[in-house]
């Protein structure tokens, strides 16, 4: 049976429906604003008790519950999960204004290379966590001896090509200072740090770039060096920031990174070979 096309004004029929949609969208905005206020309060509580920004079990349980609710309500569960994940990413932003200090507030952290892109990211994180942060660069290296004195942490955040050279040139560090690095290879830098400093040493590799908005859910590889009990506060600080920590020996880390790099180069080679075979015009 053919449907009869209405001769009524379509805009007159659509208008009340669109008004209902506008009202519902407005309510959504109000609900999101209320949720943001609650998550900001959650952030303050987490800061008070030194709790991690990201708790995977809580996030997974929340998504599972809302997916089930969506299915019961006849709404796409995938849609609800997509919306929730975007909302949760925003909530991490609202919780990141300040963090608890996992050592003593005001303790000194020296970031060698802190004016660089990744170094700046960690300077900001430590400052927002209540640490006194100083940046050591080539142009103020003459102050290195005074700067590292009394530091809780000396963090190496320089280009990989000069990492071991910079470590070797560090002045003597206090016995309770933690020496750590952020280099993307671990065997060489970790060996250099162990040779330079007789106390606590740990290798770190943040698996992200400096352009991220926050480090919640970002992976950081930890390669233990020496006196792990002395840098547990640093490990806890990364957890408070929301990072996901995974432990690998320096050798394991570098072997895996070589495999990853090989796959990246292989992918680029395959793409290039395919473009050449197709005689693609790269100008277009």
Question: Where in this protein do the model-derived segments appear?
Answer:
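Internal alpha-helical scaffold of NAD(P)-dependent oxidoreductase catalytic cores
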Residues: 217-284
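Rossmann-fold NAD(P)-binding glycine/threonine-rich loop
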Residues: 182-212
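Adenosine-cofactor binding site in Rossmann-like domains, unifying the SAM/SAH pocket
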Residues: 133-146
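N-terminal hydrophobic or amphipathic helices and topogenic motifs
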Residues: 2-110, 115, 124-132
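Hydrophobic Val/Ile/Leu positions in short beta-strands of Rossmann-like dinucleotide-binding domains
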Residues: 111-112, 156, 222
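Rossmann-fold NAD(P) dinucleotide-binding segment
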Residues: 145-148, 156-193
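Hydrophobic/small residue at the entry helix of a nucleotide-binding pocket
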Residues: 118
């Amino acid at each position: 049976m053919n449907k009869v096309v209405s001769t009524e004004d379509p805009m007159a029929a659509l208008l009340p429906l669109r008004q209902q949609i506008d009202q519902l969208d407005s309510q959504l905005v109000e609900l999101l604003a209320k949720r943001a206020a609650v998550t900001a309060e959650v952030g303050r509580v987490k800061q008070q008790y030194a709790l991690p920004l990201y708790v995977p079990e809580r996030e997974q349980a929340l998504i599972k519950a809302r997916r089930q609710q969506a299915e019961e309500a006849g709404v796409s569960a995938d849609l609800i999960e997509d919306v929730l994940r975007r909302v949760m990413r925003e909530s991490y932003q609202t919780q990141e204004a300040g963090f608890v200090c996992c050592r003593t507030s005001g303790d000194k952290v020296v970031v060698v290379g802190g004016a660089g892109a990744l170094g700046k990211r960690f300077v900001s994180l430590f400052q927002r966590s209540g640490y006194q942060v100083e940046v050591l660069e080539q142009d103020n290296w003459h102050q290195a001896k005074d700067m590292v004195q009394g530091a809780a942490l000396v963090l190496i955040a320089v280009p990989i090509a000069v990492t071991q050279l910079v470590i070797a040139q560090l002045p003597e560090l206090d016995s309770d200072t933690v020496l750590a690095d952020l280099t993307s290879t671990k065997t060489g830098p970790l060996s250099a740090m162990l040779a330079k400093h007789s106390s606590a040493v740990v290798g770190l590799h943040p698996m992200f770039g400096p352009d991220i908005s926050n480090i919640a859910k970002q992976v950081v590889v930890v390669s233990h060096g020496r006196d792990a009990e002395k840098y547990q506060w640093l490990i806890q600080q990364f957890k408070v920031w929301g990072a996901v920590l995974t432990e690998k020996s320096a050798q394991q880390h570098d072997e895996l990174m070589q495999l990853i790099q090989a796959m990246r180069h292989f992918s680029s080679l395959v793409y290039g070979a395919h473009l050449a075979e197709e005689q693609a015009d790269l100008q277009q």
